[in-house]
């Protein structure tokens, strides 16, 4: 029996059943994401720091990232057992509904779900439970990139977080603080114009960047593409996602 969705009294909730790789995920989300724009709390936060609630939307790039996590033979989820990582940890930045993080947890990785919006974290945690992710693999944290949490992570994942150029440097500062020396970062993006400016900034900040293309065919047969950016510290040479970075 499916659990009662969180925050039922705030706004109507919709259940999405998503076929991703070998799994069908149950993802709860607000039925009308646009209605959150009229929320007085959101309006107040927008006046403070231009915040907008993008988290209730199921973005195609998050589905493509989740599928790549679950299905790619080069995914850290598939290769961690071949490496010398002791107690590997994954972090999802801007987790929204938690789709990519749930995919990593389905592969056995402990995942810390983080978002700027506390409601997003509630949904991500609830969705993880609905998909039978063991509680010991799930941690949730409210996090502002300007004030990263303590801790280091071997694998950082994110989708659709590059839509504002003004946040690129802040995001990279957070990644630099949170990533282990030999860690890897996967960021998927729906090929937005703003995302094209991110790799040069990342290189300036001491990262190597590889770009590959993810493809997705939705239930309606519509094809979508997304860029997968793989980041890696420059002080380590390695092969990531099938691409040798030099």
Residues of each region from the PLM?
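S-adenosylmethionine-dependent methyltransferases
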Residues: 1-246
């Amino acid at each position: 029996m499916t659990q009662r969705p969180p925050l039922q009294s705030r706004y109507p909730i919709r259940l999405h059943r998503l076929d991703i790789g070998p799994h069908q995920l149950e993802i709860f989300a607000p039925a009308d994401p646009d209605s959150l724009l009229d929320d007085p709390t959101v309006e107040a936060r927008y006046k403070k720091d231009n915040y907008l609630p993008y988290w209730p939307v199921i973005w195609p790039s998050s589905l493509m990232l989740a599928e790549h996590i679950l299905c790619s033979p080069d995914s850290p989820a598939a290769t961690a057992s071949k490496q010398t990582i002791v107690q590997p940890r994954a972090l999802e930045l801007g987790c929204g509904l938690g789709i990519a993080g749930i995919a990593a947890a389905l592969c056995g990785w402990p995942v810390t779900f983080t978002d700027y919006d506390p409601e997003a974290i509630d949904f991500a945690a609830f969705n993880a439970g609905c998909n039978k992710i063991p509680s010991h693999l799930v941690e949730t944290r409210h996090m502002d990139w300007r004030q990263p949490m303590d801790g280091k992570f071997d694998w950082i994942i994110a989708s659709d977080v590059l839509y504002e150029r003004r946040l690129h440097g802040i995001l990279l500062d957070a990644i630099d603080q949170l990533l282990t020396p030999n860690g890897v970062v996967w960021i998927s993006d729906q090929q937005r114009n703003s995302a094209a400016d991110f790799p040069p900034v990342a290189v300036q900040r001491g990262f190597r960047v590889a770009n590959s293309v993810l493809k997705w065919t939705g239930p309606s047969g519509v094809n979508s593409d997304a860029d997968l950016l793989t980041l890696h510290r420059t002080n380590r040479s390695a092969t990531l996602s099938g691409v040798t970075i030099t």
